[in-house]
């Protein structure tokens, strides 16, 4: 005989609502803020009065508030339980007036601390002073393992630069295999502990990548770096597929983006001795292309389906069937619509799947924007060549790229993408100022004063933009002007980058 199921009901509170000369009893939830049902309560009260033949609530919407019977205003952002309202209490619906809401006063410090502690610990734990739990111990252990892995990595790379022996690679690979075994044990035994699996997995990927890079003979170079970066990309993709968490997907995408760019640079350096400036120019152009392709790549990764075309009569106009390309639909005839078993049954994803795809698209976009923003300062550093014949052209290329990064941020609705691009552009500006300051002759004026003034002016400009742009509604002509300036900057950037990289000279000769 099975035990009966227990059903939990939300806490309720029966109160009397008084308005003018009318009194009505209503039952409200006691555990949610009053704001959630306040407007509905007024509408029900108004309908009840009109049903009984009275005039109803004469106050306009949004111009009333609740008071206790003694005239104390109630804060509708809090629940009835937090406000101390009990069953049988009378609340008065009155016009809104100026003033502050009621706040409970405590006669002693101990009473106030006790009440605050009770509120902080209402979810089952004291959030003011978090105790040491098993989760804390596990995360501390992972931090200790990460410290040990860092020491092993440093010693492995140091030893590999000195000797061509396979011992460093074997040592790093052996410890990496142990971490892989630990990740598999967590995956099989405690599948819900994604944090431990991620910790073991990322540390194992780093160790195995270093081991793979150190294994081939010869002095460490571009070929060794390419091998290690490929291992990191494969390991990151494996972790992302296994965990399927939103933040983990963003981290994996950022790692794959950065390592993919570095792998492309290493592959070029394997076959041709390309200068750092030329590589940096190519990276800058590639970063702009990646930013423009971010939505397309995210949609491709998430496998977003085309929209479903229906009619207001409820009959499908177009539908997709199994075996058709994802970007095509077929018209649905009346005979097909009446047949329940026809092969034109629409297979478009429903609401839950669309929401999951949207989260995946957002995570991929965040990762790509973060990865590109991490590479941008290094690329700007490589492009700039102070006190060289074409230094002004390099400065122009870097400045146009930074400006395009900032303007591209307005194309992303989510905050993390835009913030990542703007922060990456700002870091690139600081990197450029730092390179010019370090390259100038040692002196107070050129090495400190002018760079500090420039950085301070740039920060002040950023603060002014942050205060003005979000609160201002710009006219269409201004937005159109910004778009045209962005197009002109792109048109000027490509020839300047080609001239700086020597493409025109190479074509001429």
Swiss-Prot record:
The chain crosses the membrane at residues 135-155, 170-190, 196-216, 222-242, 248-268, 281-301, 364-384, 389-409, 418-438, 449-469, 487-507. It is found in: Cell membrane. GO terms for biological process: symbiont-mediated evasion of host immune response. The gene is eccD2. Belongs to the EccD/Snm4 family. Disulfide bonds: none annotated. InterPro entries: EccD_transm (IPR044049), T7SS_EccD (IPR006707), YukD-like (IPR024962). This is ESX-2 secretion system protein eccD2. Its main location: membrane. The keyword Chaperone does not apply. Was identified as a high-confidence drug target. Keywords: Cell membrane, Membrane, Transmembrane, Transmembrane helix. The keyword Transmembrane helix applies. It is a multi-pass membrane protein. Pfam families: EccD, YukD. Part of the ESX-2 / type VII secretion system (T7SS), which is composed of cytosolic and membrane components. One of its GO terms (cellular component) is plasma membrane.
């Amino acid at each position: 005989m099975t035990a009966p199921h227990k059903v939990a009901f939300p806490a309720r509170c029966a109160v009397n609502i008084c308005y003018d000369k009318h009194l009505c009893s209503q039952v409200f939830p006691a555990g949610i803020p009053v704001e959630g049902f306040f407007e509905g309560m007024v509408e029900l009260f108004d309908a009840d009065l009109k049903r009984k033949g009275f005039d109803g609530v004469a106050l306009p919407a949004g111009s009333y508030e609740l008071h206790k019977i003694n005239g104390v205003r109630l804060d509708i952002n809090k629940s009835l339980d937090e406000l101390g309202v009990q069953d049988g209490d009378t609340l008065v619906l009155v016009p809104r007036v100026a003033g502050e809401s009621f706040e409970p006063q405590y006669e002693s410090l101990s009473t106030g601390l006790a009440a605050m502690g009770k509120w902080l610990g209402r979810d089952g734990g004291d959030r003011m002073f978090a105790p040491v739990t098993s989760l804390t111990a596990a995360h501390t252990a992972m931090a200790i393992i990460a410290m040990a892995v860092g020491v092993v990595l440093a010693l492995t790379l140091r030893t590999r630069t000195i000797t061509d022996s396979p011992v460093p690679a074997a040592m790093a690979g052996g410890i990496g295999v142990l971490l892989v075994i630990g990740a598999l044990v967590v995956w099989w035994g405690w599948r819900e502990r994604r944090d431990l699996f991620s910790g073991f997995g990322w540390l194992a990927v780093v160790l195995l990548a270093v081991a793979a890079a150190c294994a081939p003979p010869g002095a460490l170079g571009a070929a060794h770096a390419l091998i290690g970066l490929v291992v990191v990309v494969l390991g990151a993709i494996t972790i992302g597929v296994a965990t399927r968490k939103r933040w983990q997907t963003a981290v994996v995408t950022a790692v794959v983006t950065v390592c993919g760019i570095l792998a492309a640079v290493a592959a070029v350096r394997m076959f041709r001795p390309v200068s750092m400036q030329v590589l940096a120019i190519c990276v800058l152009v590639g970063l702009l292309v990646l930013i423009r392709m971010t939505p397309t790549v995210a949609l491709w990764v998430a496998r977003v389906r085309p929209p479903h075309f229906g009619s207001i009569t409820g009959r499908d106009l177009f539908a997709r069937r199994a075996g058709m390309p994802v970007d095509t639909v077929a018209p649905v005839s009346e005979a097909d619509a009446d047949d329940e078993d026809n092969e034109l049954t629409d297979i478009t994803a429903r609401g839950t799947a669309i929401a999951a795809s949207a989260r995946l698209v957002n995570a991929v976009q965040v990762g790509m924007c973060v990865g590109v923003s991490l590479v941008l300062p290094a690329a700007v550093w490589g492009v700039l060549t102070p006190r060289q014949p074409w230094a002004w052209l390099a400065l122009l290329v870097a400045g146009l790229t930074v400006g395009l990064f900032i303007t591209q941020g307005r194309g992303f609705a989510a905050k993390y993408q835009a913030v990542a691009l703007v922060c990456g552009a700002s870091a690139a500006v600081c990197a450029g100022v730092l390179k010019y300051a370090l390259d100038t002759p040692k002196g107070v004026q050129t090495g400190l004063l002018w760079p500090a003034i420039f950085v301070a002016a740039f920060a002040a400009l950023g603060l002014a933009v942050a205060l003005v742009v979000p609160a201002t509604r710009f006219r269409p002509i201004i937005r159109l002007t910004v778009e045209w300036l962005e197009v002109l900057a792109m048109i000027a950037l490509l020839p300047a980058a080609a001239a700086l990289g020597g493409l025109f000279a190479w074509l001429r000769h």
